[in-house]
């Protein structure tokens, strides 16, 4: 059994039914789903006030327990507004001492890239609560590979690809915020 800890640093979850279906699906599989109060929370287009959403992220540094899976409820917009105020030092220290498994994509990627930039912290670009775990029928490929990525030390890497790059190629490098 795993413990999922929900965070909602971005947009309000428009599909509440899907989010609660995701919670139910995880619980029926034997997992605990904590911090569900973020699902219905709303401030204009966001999943709460900036203070609430920032607190969701900063409190991860002191979250008790090991091997917790931090799962974003959904993406959208809003995480980038939090970046200058996140306690990166505390989050990086936590991840180095007692790592949380942090998973999401879309707008949540800004926070994941912040962890990478500030401390070389590895996170998972993977399913989120509402759109994936809460889908009417969860994609079996997504579910299988999510658990494989979290539980296996050996990930499949036998694929090869060849492609011709088209269009202008512009190498870039910059901070994700100022």
At which residue positions do the language-model features occur?
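Short, acidic/small-residue loops that bind anionic groups at enzyme active sites
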Residues: 88-114, 122-129
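Conserved anion/nucleotide-ligand pocket segment
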Residues: 121-178
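Short glycine-/acidic-enriched loop or helix-start segments at secondary-structure transitions
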Residues: 16, 80-83, 112-114, 135
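N-terminal glycine-rich "phosphate-gripper" loop used for MgATP/nucleotide binding
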Residues: 71-85, 105
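Hydrophobic structural segments
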Residues: 60, 114, 172-173
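Structural motif
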Residues: 33, 69-71, 103
